[in-house]
Design a protein with these regions (language model features):
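Amphipathic, oligomerization/interface secondary-structure segments
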Residues: 3-121
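Polyanionic, low-complexity intrinsically disordered segments
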Residues: 107-117, 124-214
Length: 214
């Protein structure tokens, strides 16, 4: 997977304390939502300015980037993607997997059914005991880990940055860049007009991901 996703997953896998492991799961889900939002916005932006309604819908949550708002933005962006999107997997992933995982059953927003409720309990519940954390982890570990095999399509996208020596690929949890031998046609050159830019590449598809540098 691209490094922005692989790193929090590695932290989750290596963590042994149940409270910290729950937090690591929350971090991984939030970063996944961010990546999906930025990919979707990038794909839409390639076609011109974002639709005005979508711009209005995103204005508040993008200025208040909490997990619940990232979930809302992911759904809004997914619903705005056209049929010929370069990301055909994104909308069904958000609709069929992430939204049910985060929201849980309607009218049953409890910490054992809604991942958003779990995140809010961790953040605002005044702390939890190790015993309770272990119980919650036993409940959430299977559905959390079942999400990630559905992300394999993201591994097909190369997350590329420009370096002094050319280009490097952000892949896996390693701190170093992989070599990325790319030619530089005009669209690629334009996408890297910012030194800190990040570009997602898949075949002849190119999506600028500048928000990942924030």
């Amino acid at each position: 997977l691209p490094t922005p996703l692989a790193l929090p997953l590695r932290d989750y896998q290596q963590e042994t304390h149940p409270v910290l492991k729950l937090w690591a799961a929350c971090d991984a889900v939030e970063i996944l939502l961010r990546v999906l939002v930025f990919l979707g916005i990038g794909d839409l932006s390639r076609r011109g300015e974002l639709p005005e309604q979508l711009r209005r819908e995103l204005r508040y949550p993008i200025e208040n980037p909490m997990l619940g708002n990232w979930r809302r933005m992911a759904q809004q962006v997914a619903e705005a993607l056209p049929e010929d999107t370069a990301l055909p997997e994104l909308s069904p992933l958000v609709r069929d997997n992430l939204v049910p995982f985060l929201d849980g059953p309607k009218r049953r927003s409890s910490v054992d059914r809604s991942f958003l409720a779990l995140r809010n309990r961790l953040a605002h519940g005044g702390g939890i005991s190790r015993r309770l954390a272990a119980e919650l982890l036993a409940n959430w570990q299977p559905p959390f880990e079942a999400l990630w095999p559905r992300m394999t399509w993201l591994a097909d996208w190369a997350f590329v940055i420009r370096t002094d020596g050319g280009y490097g690929r952000l892949r896996g949890p390693r701190p170093t860049l992989e070599p990325c031998g790319l030619t530089t046609p005009e669209p690629l050159t334009a996408a890297f007009s910012s030194v800190d830019g990040v570009v997602a590449l898949h075949g002849d598809q190119l999506i600028p991901l500048w928000p990942l540098t924030l």
